[in-house]
Amino acid sequence: MTQVLSRVVEVVVFTRTGGAARVLVMRRAPDEPLNPGIWQIITGTLEGEETAVEGALREVGEETGLKPLRMWSVPYVNSFFDRKRNAVHMIPWFAVEADPAAKVRLSEEHVEFQWTSFDRAASLMAWPGQRHGIGIVMEEIVGGGPAASLTEIPL
């Protein structure tokens, strides 16, 4: 029987300056065993009994060194099928707003980063679910859609 798992989170980190929002994208190191060299948003696995929110906050700190100013639960759950485990992974999405003056400190998983437009960030993603999710963050969270006020997580 196929399992359904939820041990992975994805986080879109963005800043706002001068009325423009920018998204953080990072390139995975070429020697990473999983998806080497691709551009991605923050993607990480939960540890122990941590909640998805706790894992998302930890991953933001570990992968970027940034401290979120605000956080939202994005009204989107990504998914993929893992053939090796015969499992469907359900991935909750989060968005965090960071201080535009803060310095990014990459983990060893990544070799470069850039702050870019939402459209460009989506075009860099290898996976259609990530492209779709980035659009939802732009429309609902950054764009002030109805979900923004309903899904903000107090920090």
List the predicted regions and their residue ranges.
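Conserved Nudix-box catalytic region and its N-terminal flanking loop in Nudix hydrolases
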Residues: 20-62
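Active-site segment of metal-dependent pyrophosphate-handling enzymes
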Residues: 61, 65-102
